[in-house]
Amino acid sequence: MKRSVLYILCSLVTTLLVASCCPKNPAPNSVKTAHGNTDWHIDTAEEFLTGNDINGNPSASNHCPDTWTKTHMHVGLTNTNTYYYDKGVTAAGQDNLSTNGIDKPMLFFYAGHGAPTLFNTLGNSAYLTNMRLGNCQGSNDGTLRYYWQCSCEVFAHGPKTCTGIPYDYACPGDFDGSPDSDNMRNVYERWGPILNPALRMACGSSTLAYCHEGETNKIWDNYNNKGYDVADAFIDGLHRYTWNTPLCITTGGLFVSGTPLFDNTFTNAPNPSGSYYHIQYLSNFATTAPSIFEVIIPEFLPIYELIPLPLPDPLRKYKFVEKDDWMYSTDEIKGRGPAIKVNRISGAVYLLGEQRFDEKAKPLEEKEYISLAERFIENQGLTEKDISKPAGTRMVIQRISREEKQPDIQKFQKNVTLTFKRQITLDSKTVPFVGEGGLISIQLNNDGTLFNASKVWRQIKEISRTTRAKTYEQAYNEALAQIKERDAYKLADWTWGYEEQAGNVRQTELKAVFIFNFLPVDPEKIIDYPPRIIKISAHIE
């Protein structure tokens, strides 16, 4: 009898222990997306996964790797905020559900309208105060590792206004340690409680954001093709316009290089965490800026025939193996893969180096990075005649203590990138390029050594035909016709130029486009009227 009771008690204890535990890690390379609005954001959430819109039409050439396990959640549902909530905070929380909960995969991506303390969830809104991510404790069963969000201001950080910048919360580096308020946003205060120790990072936009196929395409082009690490791929990918300042936040120890902000690839392992918060954001060089062109639209615009770029002569000494559309060098960078890869359908070239970071070393002067980048492209045979002066950016990490009431704010440079843009001359006027091609990009470690480099630059064979060009007024009116609530929007800026695609795209023609950036007239109504980016063909065909 005693043995029977003991057996029953042991079985009960075992059952309770198993029930109270959850899987240590999520499934490797598992990704789920959700949309908070059924406007273009439902397409964005699908494009992130497959490169298609919600109806299956191809729309983005780069997307989540094909080998990953993918799910687009909440399609056809309404009032989905409970799937973002943790039941340890609110009884309604269901973020641990295997079907619709966001706290289950390795990576979760959200696209929709937002504001500093909330974001839309298909009819209602989710508030940050009800969220906890990666908390695999008891029955919470949260195993998320990476949380990516494309919304306006949900990750707002720093002062509302910055000198010389007309957009709110565009300078996270000027954060002064104040509590979260409308005038000084504090991402540590709002997102700190959400970051349970196992979550590796959460990323979003400090400023206004636009989220569609162009943004998801650039994020995955950065990661899949250019070799950017996880945080860099998101931040650079979402920073397509001057008014968009993304950032990532994580917990970690004293040494910044030991944090997930240095994840070269996605992992389903938990974050070792630590007693510090770290954020990463992008900052422009003080000494360089993109070229400003005199905007004169010619009466006629050539359409050019493109062919793949020949392999640069200095790279012909390497041995390559071919697989599908790619050539991979047999030389490898330890822990990163082939030192060189070439896309055969475009001729795009990608080069890798070792990642180096010394927290105590002083970064170089900006002019030294520019000189090193120019020397590299010359030595590797990447130089072109029709090229802009480089625009320089730096990735910056900000660190504070999680425990001190008035923490010391410290900053570190993580790496720098120099970007050279292609140009075409028409009627003695310089026409710029837009898109993910027509670029030479050199990412350097702080000591000036190579981390990543790419040249996406198809060769122009000849002019295939010439068309009349649309005037600015014609293109603007076409763009405006796509906005229903015209009185709620204003034109913030616009550009035009020839559009070259990412390096893994088969592109045989080079055409010009107008790109119009519309922002809300009332900045306080961004959740109702988020930014709109509208692209219009510049040709009358």
Give residue ranges: language-model regions.
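A domain-level signal for caspase-like cysteine endopeptidase catalytic cores
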Residues: 22-118, 149, 164, 168-179
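Charged, low-complexity helical/coil segments in non-catalytic cytosolic or luminal regions
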Residues: 450, 456-510
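Bacterial N-terminal signal peptides
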Residues: 8-17
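Active-site-proximal C-terminal subdomain of hydrolase catalytic domains
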Residues: 155-291
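Bacterial N-terminal signal peptides that target proteins for export
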Residues: 1-9
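Conserved histidines in hydrophobic membrane contexts and catalytic metal-binding motifs
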Residues: 373, 442, 514-516
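A short, glycine/acidic-enriched catalytic loop
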Residues: 114-142, 146-162
